[in-house]
Structure formats: structure tokens, C-alpha cells
């Protein structure tokens, strides 16, 4: 060992050493690590290290094959030595801690930050679209040494350190360096994927906050809250063909039928069945005290094996997942997010979720995520009061808090906060290949007085209640999504009359390409919950939606929100005895799938679950042993098949040219009839809905073209549990004008039924019609 003689006097003051020892130095690189230092006329380097648990330390220079003892300076755990070399290569530290000896690389020897000044500039502007590749924890190599680079935005912090198993959760050991714009950064050599970590943030009042990483790619399973180092670039994707096709698609011309799912309550596995990872190794059980005894969550990989074939068989085009970003409380359904960049660990690893999405794409199923940029919870390890100040939220509770939900509101006027959220939306498309987002609670973002009484909100700069900053943010997000990912979906859950929600940003719209039609949903559920006799007085509930159907690009959704909190499940809302309940539901769904607009159904509705949705349970799968439930499931399957194979039902969903009434005025019989037309085609369908239990043996409607109209769908079919009334495969027109049309059909209308008829185009179609069972 050489270099054992200490420097005659250190260049450091006691104050500098104490700042390091007390974790008060904002740039530890100014003190720790290697520094050029001439000693007795010879060029060299002074190397300093603060090692809180070490009794002895030495510097190992592998290139020189030499070792230099370090000596305490002003503090028993602050060590220093001098190395007589003009050029110093990366060195190691030999540390003696009691009876244990370790050799490590010095984090403060690595001075090549991952973040560039340009990265920081873009972030400060709010325009770094891939900031998730810079902030957070990223496995990388510096100076040919593998490790993890950490970076976090905490501008009001006095000091920030990294905590983890690798340093005994001691914030003194890995103190981060402050960069411009309040970003803190440090590379920890030899750290690997899977390490748990947090940030220890100290403010100027001396308060210490332990926070999970806002940009962390993985978190521990709750109730633990640490982030986990993850590498999202290791998975090998197999969906290139899907992504290429999506890029060239025009979503509004496509059939979009969405199955809305909460992964934790769709189906459970027996707790005796051991879940495994990609290599077949057993996974530790996820603690869920509120699940039924003997049950556990399915993993992402198990869901790929069970959910995807189920959805594929039913004919849905997309799966929409209730939020899978990390959240601490199961009962929030995922809508109170703490880890915006982390797929929840309840069901497996990031690679497991990638596998799930990949399998969906390989089976022709798109994936939509519920995204929650409107608010976030107050959990101490999350974004709230992140650096000891209101960093992500507004300081004034009149702007920064949703009291009804007990959550905080993002400050959309702050560039870095907008960047955090906008990049997060792009992140899910980029890293997880998702196909769309549904933005939750858009109305709560757009209105400053949302669920607030007078005096509980602050007007905008013009004295109005519109949240101008939030609207601008949504325009920015949607513009970026469609710029980077053509063919993607961005869907708004917006419950007010805010104009042009689904119009392009270049004409002043918010830029979504679809909006949930909340008005249609409320009108339909009100209407179908009535005794059918009273429906004649409420025909407007059925017809009103067409008046505004083309003012936005609408999606018709019967979602999770309608089957909780005492509202009953969908089948339970229907009046009458069991037969009528199922017939009503089939009629409702038939009208829904023939009405203009894309479609969304929540899980369990497809087979008539009686119980309300329970996030702690799973679906009532045992009901499928009974014929009415089997029939309803078959009905939904056939309805999806009809919808996806009939361009007239989807290609002009957002255009008046795709719809025309035949008759919407037959209030007395509660019957409506209309035509759906295909894009740039003469093909059309005739739809007739009878909303009462009263059948009609002879009901005449006008049609525009003479010929044989084949009955291609009848919700009263015996296979669905209906009475099997119908039109024996179809009807020829009569030269009898009706409803201002030159020809008409004399139809048999079954009770509580949706009928769909198609003009036969040739002898083959006529033959098919003749062989139809109805």
C-alpha cells in the first residue's frame, strides 16, 4: 500500500466537512470525489469520501495497481487522500466497516450527467416530450461502469438524497447534486434493476420527506411505497404489424366496441394456485385482506391467458382498463394515482404488463387505459407537498383541492407539471404500446367551480369559471398524442356542454377524437328503468340524442359508474319479471349498437350480472350455468359480430349522412325506426325498436328501395332467451308509400325487441334469407 502519508493540511474547512456530514451541501461534487491538487510541486488528485459507517478506507487505482490509504479529516467518517497522477481513471474505495470489508466505486467520481443542459431547458419550458427517459431511475453505463442514474425535480428542497436497501436507507450516503431548475441528480455505480429506493427530501425548515419517485417505472406492492429500479427496454415486442396497421387507420371510420375491465375484480384465482413470473419462478402472494377467503388476483400473464380469449370470443375490438398506474388504495379503483409512470405491481412486473398488451395486439385487440390527470391523492409518499412546498398542486385550496374527493388538483399553469403529465400520456403509448387513453373527469379539470360553492373557487383572469390553463393543457396533450401516434384514441369523459371537446385543436377544439355521450346514457337508463306503459310519455328520451349526435364524435358508454353506489347492475335496472328484464336489456343493447357512436360496456353486463360491481370480489361467473345468462352472452357476441361486420353501423358514426329517421314519432306504441348508411356506399340497414312488451303482427314502415329485406338480427331470437317471433327470414316490400317513402315493409315486431334488416343484394343473399330460422 502506498500513499499512506496524509496531506499536511486539508484544503477543506470544518464548515465544508460539516455540511456534508449534516447533509446540507447542495453540490457534494464540490467537496467529495476527485479534485486536481498539487502537493509539494507534484500534480495529482485529492480524493475525498464521506463514509458514515467506515472506520478505515483506501483508494484503489486499478490502472496503477496501487492502493492509497485515506485519513479522517475534521470528522471521524470523512476521509481524504492524495494520488500523485496527472490523469486519474475511475477508481474504487476499499471500506472497512467493523468486521466487514467492501470494495465499491465512488459515486462522486462520475461527473458525466445523463441530463444535458438542453434537457433541463426543454423541461423548464414544458416541452420535453421524453422527459421520462431522463428523470427517474435509469440503468446505464458511465465510464464503462454499469449503474443507475437518478434524477428528480425538487426546486424548493435544501437537500435531496437517495435511500435504499443498498445504503441501509441512510440519506447521508448518497447525497444528490443540484442542477439548474431545481433538478437533483446522482449516478450510483453497480446498482442494478430491482433495487428499492426513495428520495429523502429536506426543506429549509429542516423537515424531511421520504418520497417515491414521480417518474419511477415500478413500485413495491402496497402497503409498501418504495420505487423499484426497472428497465423498460428489455422486453421483445411482437406487435409490429399491429402498430403499423394502426398508424394508417382512421379511428372514426372503424368499429370500436370496448370491453371495460377492472383487472383486480374481473376474475380471481385460487390462492392455492401459485402465480409465476416469465421464467416460471413462483411470485410472492399479493396481500389483499378484503378478498374472499382463498382468492387472489390474477397476474398480467394469467389475465392474458384468460381475459384475451374471452374478449376475443365475444367480438370486442378493444379492452379498456380501469387505471393500472400505481395507486395505494384498492378501493379507489385506481383513480387516486401516486405512481403515474408505474404499472401497478398488484398483478406483476412491467414486463408482465407489456406481455399482456403484446398478446392483445397479436390477437387483434386494442388496449385503452383510463388516465387520471385531473387530481391526485394526499398520501405522504406521493406527489403532495413533494419538496416541502405545493410543487405539483396549487397552494390555494380554492384552486388546489377537490374536497368532495379528498384529492389535490394539478397546477396546469406550471410548465414542469404540464410536462410531467403530457409526457406521461406519451409514455404509455411509447413504452407499453397502448392504443388509447380515456381521460377521467375532464369536467372537473375544465371548470374552476366544479363541485364548489360560492367563495370556494377563484375566477380566471377574465372573471369566468373556465380553467383556461387546463383546457390549454388538454389541447397540448391531444396534439402530441396524434402527432407521435397516428391512429391512436383519446377519449374524454366530459359530462357538461363544453363546446368542441372532440374537435381538432386547429379549429379551437380540445382535440380529443371521442367523447363519452353522458346525456345518451342518462336518458337511456331513465327510459329503460320505467314501466313500459309509461314510456309512451317519454319518447323524447330515446330520440333527443340524435339532435346532437353529430355535434361531437361520441362514444356510447354503459360504464362502471352506473353499477355502483346503490345504482344496481344493468339487468337490475330493468322493469318487469325476469323474462322482461332480459328482454329489456337486449332491446337496450340492440338500440345502443345501432345508434350512432362507438360503444363501451363494463364487464359483467355481457351476461347479466345481478349484483353491483364490487371491487373486492369478482364477477358472478356461476350465473353462466343458467340459460337466460347464457342467452344474453350469446346475444352480445352476435351483436358485436353484427356491428363489426356492418360498415353502416360504424363508418359514418360521426356524420349526419350515416343516419336518418324513418319514424321517431310513434309515441303511442313506443316504437322507433331508422336507417343507418355506410360511408361512400349505397349499402344501408333498417333498424326497428319496439320498447314495449306488446308485439305487433303487422307494423308498417317506409323504406327507400324496393326488394327483399333480410332480417339479419332479432334480439327476440330463441337462442337469446326470447319468444322467437320474427319475419321468417325477411320481407318483400309493398308498393305502398309510408313515412314519405315510396315503398314499405309489413313487419312482425316481437316484444321488447331490436330488429335489423338489410336489403338483399343478390340471389345468394335471398337464398340465405330463405334459410333463416326466423
Swiss-Prot record:
Q: How does activity depend on temperature?
A: Optimum temperature is about 35 degrees Celsius.
Q: Which UniProt keywords apply?
A: Carbohydrate metabolism, Glycogen biosynthesis, Glycogen metabolism, Glycosyltransferase, Transferase
| Any Gene Ontology biological process | glycogen biosynthetic process
Q: Spell out the GO cellular component terms annotated for this protein, sorted alphabetically and separated by semicolons.
A: cytosol
One Pfam family assigned to this protein is: GlgB_N
Q: Which InterPro entries match?
A: A-amylase/branching_C, Branching_enzy, GlgB, GlgB_N, GlgB_N_E_set_prok, Glyco_hydro_13_cat_dom, Glyco_hydro_13_N, Glyco_hydro_b
Annotated coiled-coil segments of the chain: none
Active site per database record: 440 (nucleophile), 493 (proton donor)
List the catalysed reactions: Transfers a segment of a (1->4)-alpha-D-glucan chain to a primary hydroxy group in a similar glucan chain
Q: In which pathway does it act?
A: Glycan biosynthesis; glycogen biosynthesis
- Gene3D superfamilies, alphabetized: Glycosidases, Golgi alpha-mannosidase II, Immunoglobulins
**Any GO MF annotation of the entry:** hydrolase activity, hydrolyzing O-glycosyl compounds
EC?
2.4.1.18
So what does this one do?
Catalyzes the formation of the alpha-1,6-glucosidic linkages in glycogen by scission of a 1,4-alpha-linked oligosaccharide from growing alpha-1,4-glucan chains and the subsequent attachment of the oligosaccharide to the alpha-1,6 position.
Tell me how this protein assembles: Monomer.
Please report which protein family the annotation says this sequence is part of: Belongs to the glycosyl hydrolase 13 family. GlgB subfamily.
The record's section on NCBIfam families has: branching_enzym, PRK05402.1, PRK12313.1
Q: What is this protein called?
A: 1,4-alpha-glucan branching enzyme GlgB
Gene behind this protein: glgB
